[in-house]
């Protein structure tokens, strides 16, 4: 979700997200900053042996056609999706810049609104705003979501059920901060086709809720 984002180390070395360790992943789901028109994704690695193994896994475990060395699956990106991404990749920086401008519009408009916490970015990093997510305090999040929906303003909660409460991972862990965030976060519309007039409508009505 942070493709195109950069991190600056204390020695001023700059690296992109997905390249900070030996392996990184990204999704090309259509709503992502760099999305195809179907399902897709990519794995980044600086380890040639690992890259070789990954290529086999995503191609039925094949090293040579019809010779299966390991258990694999069919996770190849089809040529149509690849071509769409090849074109859109040229515009990734532009897409991310547009999202940053929209996020800044929200931040400036909401900086004096009580009972919310807008996203913050540390000086050594940046945000490409796949989502514009803020916190709504004092138990007002769900009522705000209903209010926005009644005005035709979409909003989303990422995510209403945290991982530690999902059945496959539930082991009665108590993660207090995770639960608090899950009850408070809400994401407002942000994408490259959002017109200024529509964002103004969202901002005006969002602020009205807290007056």
Regions found by a protein language model. Give the residues of each.
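Active-site pre-lysine segment of PLP-dependent enzymes
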Residues: 1-31
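Glycine-rich phosphate-binding loop of ATP-grasp-fold ATP-dependent ligases
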Residues: 33, 37-42
